[in-house]
Amino acid sequence: MSSPPPARKGFYRQEVTKTAWEVRAVYQDLQPVGSGAYGAVCSAVDSRTGNKVAIKKLYRPFQSELFAKRAYRELRLLKHMRHENVIGLLDVFTPDESLDDFTDFYLVMPFMGTDLGKLMKHETLSEDRIQFLVYQMLKGLKYIHAAGVIHRDLKPGNLAVNEDCELKILDFGLARQADSEMTGYVVTRWYRAPEVILNWMRYTQTVDIWSVGCIMAEMITGKILFKGNDHLDQLKEIMKITGTPPPEFVQKLQSAEAKNYMEGLPELEKKDFASVLTNASPQAVNLLERMLVLDAEQRVTAAEALTHPYFESLRDTEDEPKAQKYDDSFDDVDRTLEEWKRVTYKEVLSFKPPRQLGARVPKETAL
């Protein structure tokens, strides 16, 4: 058997959990951090700055058109996002020297240390920390939504947190219907808005606000708010608190099946949120009542939620940069595998890092 060619100049090879990694020599001390449905993550130290970074390697991104399309979208979304509460790219590189050889690329992002799910398992969060974390979630969402992107799968596990309680939203805009077909992974539905779980209608950005409400309630009580065993059980759990919706809401549902189901439900009164959320301040309860509304059209937006009195002590409107619209017209084009490869390779090569690797992006460039 012939041995593999030597690593590209300026790169080195290392095996990490039975996978060959070939990374730029500036990234030292590769340590496995975790792996998911689509890729693995290592921490490393950027030898130029001494900063710890996270490097993600996608599993065989060009194994099919579907995987290639997803990899391309992830790269373009990460390149687009420049906000302190949204994960963005510090670097992207490929060890492959030409388009013909192109099979892998690596995404370099800030290293955050933990996620909100792990944090909640290990400690009870004070009201101040809850307020600061929710404020950052909403700032990140306001920016993502202004870019025209919907997260679709916000949950504690994809909210990265560092030791200073600074939060960044991960994996935005990637949760598409193809996920379970591609990987067999079942998506957690406990944080998903009812209109997403049941495919009621074309959903809007407020699906993410529902998720923030579920996460905020869990931080306050230490318990998952709506823990259904399946789709319909999830809806029952939700309605035990929100009550059954009025007839005018049921009329808006686009699916006849959903309409019939809703009309057949026994009537449930809305619960007083303060009784469910013991220990929560009146302002926190009021904010949650505006987030956890069955009718998505009546739900508060991220921009509106940020003006709520609950955040009065934190709000800094100067600190809410505007986003440029993300152009997703490229993402849904039908392309051959070779074409996906070509456009992805072009995106990798055209990446320009933030002014200083590892530095916070200055406000005037945070567009």
UniProtKB/Swiss-Prot annotation:
Activated by phosphorylation on threonine and tyrosine. MAP2K3/MKK3 and MAP2K6/MKK6 are both essential for the activation of MAPK12 induced by environmental stress, whereas MAP2K6/MKK6 is the major MAPK12 activator in response to TNF-alpha. Its main location: cytoplasm. It comes from the Eukaryota. Binds 2 magnesium ions. The modification Phosphothreonine is found at T183. Residues 27-311 form the Protein kinase domain. Dually phosphorylated on Thr-183 and Tyr-185 by MAP2K3/MKK3 and MAP2K6/MKK6, which activates the enzyme. Ubiquitinated. Ubiquitination leads to degradation by the proteasome pathway. The TXY motif contains the threonine and tyrosine residues whose phosphorylation activates the MAP kinases. Belongs to the protein kinase superfamily. CMGC Ser/Thr protein kinase family. MAP kinase subfamily. This is Mitogen-activated protein kinase 12. It comes from Mus musculus. The gene is Mapk12.
